[in-house]
């Protein structure tokens, strides 16, 4: 992936809880792709725009590291 693009596990921001992937629209806003959701150590790669984000999940995302830092305030 090089130095520019990163695959990273991130915590879901509190303001996104109970919203759908389509509602947060990070692909359009930040050019970041959600690869999977992780809960209880298990990855769920079967996600759609209608998938709702839950409190105890994290995301596996792919994008430019600068975009990931900006989006998730890393």
Stretch-by-stretch model annotation:
Residues 4-5:
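Short, small-residue-biased leader/transition segments that mark boundaries at the very start
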Residues 10-16:
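Short, surface-exposed ligand-recognition loops at beta-strand->loop->(often short) alpha-helix junctions
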Residues 16-74:
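Cytosolic Rossmann-like ligand/nucleotide-binding regulatory domains
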């Amino acid at each position: 992936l090089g130095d520019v693009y990163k695959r990273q596990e991130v915590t879901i921001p509190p303001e996104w809880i109970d919203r759908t992937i389509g509602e947060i629209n990070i692909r359009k806003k930040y050019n970041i792709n959600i690869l999977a959701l992780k809960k209880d150590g298990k990855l769920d790669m079967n996600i759609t725009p209608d998938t709702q984000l839950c409190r105890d999940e994290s995301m596996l995302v792919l994008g430019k590291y600068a975009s990931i830092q900006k989006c998730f305030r890393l």
